[in-house]
Regions:
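ATP/adenylate-binding site constellation spanning eukaryotic-like Ser/Thr protein kinases
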Residues: 27, 76-79, 97, 174
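Amphipathic alpha-helical dimerization/coiled-coil segments
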Residues: 46-76
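Minor-groove-contacting beta-hairpin "wing" of winged helix-turn-helix DNA-binding domains
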Residues: 23, 28-35
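Cytosolic beta-strand hydrophobic patch enriched in CBS
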Residues: 8, 61-62, 80-94, 127-129, ...
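Tandem CBS (Bateman) regulatory domains
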Residues: 34-56, 96-146, 160-188
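N-terminal helix-turn-helix
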Residues: 1-24
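The C-terminal cap of the DNA-recognition helix in HTH/winged-HTH DNA-binding domains
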Residues: 18, 75-76, 142-143
Length: 188
């Protein structure tokens, strides 16, 4: 296909065999090497890892819960954000530490207000499906500058005003992403 003779390619192929990038087998020919580049192997593994394989349990609060209760949940669960759901359990919004801090700072009535007053509302919530790759999830986190994403599946309930409804099945965070990178770096 390249229009090159075998003797011309032989020295290049011999070098690739010595590096372990390809294997030479008599009567078979050349195949991908068993000592494939660790970086290439790691990136293939990362591209094939799905969110559902690494997601954590969601930390959920109802939209009628008070801001005070949300702050307590945030600290008790040791998370950076809470996923807010409606009475049917569908994604309603998300509330972060920053949201709570901005709302409560200097506001004496903040603790009794419902979280629905403070949260980022759906459809403005960035989320991910369980079947997306962790690379896609990481891109969303970086592009939208968020620390975590709710993992959602389409709800069996009807849409509200043309907006799809989502059931929350998990969450993926920067900590999970960092753990994935660390596991790859140390070869687990």
């Amino acid at each position: 296909m390249l229009g090159l003779s075998r003797p011309t390619l032989r020295s290049d192929l011999a070098l690739l065999v010595m590096l372990g990038l390809i294997d030479a087998k008599p009567k078979v020919g050349y195949t991908p090497g068993s000592a494939m580049s660790p970086g290439l192997h790691a990136s293939r593994k990362l591209l094939n890892t799905k969110v559902k394989e690494v997601q954590a349990l969601p930390v959920i609060v109802k939209e009628n819960a008070s801001v005070g209760d949300a702050v307590v949940s945030l600290f008790m669960e040791n998370v950076g954000s809470l996923i807010v759901v409606d009475d049917q359990g569908c994604l309603s919004g998300i509330i972060s530490r920053k949201d709570l801090l901005k709302f409560t700072f200097g506001n004496t009535n903040a603790a009794t207000m419902p979280v629905s007053m403070v949260m980022t509302r759906e459809p403005n919530v960035i989320h991910v499906s369980p079947d997306e790759s962790v690379v896609d999830a990481a891109k969303k986190m970086i592009n939208h500058q968020v620390d975590s994403l709710p993992v959602v599946v389409p709800s069996k309930l009807e849409q509200t005003g043309g907006i799809p409804r989502w059931d929350v099945v998990g969450r993926i965070t920067k900590t999970i992403m960092t753990k994935i990178l660390l596991d790859m770096a140390v070869g687990h």
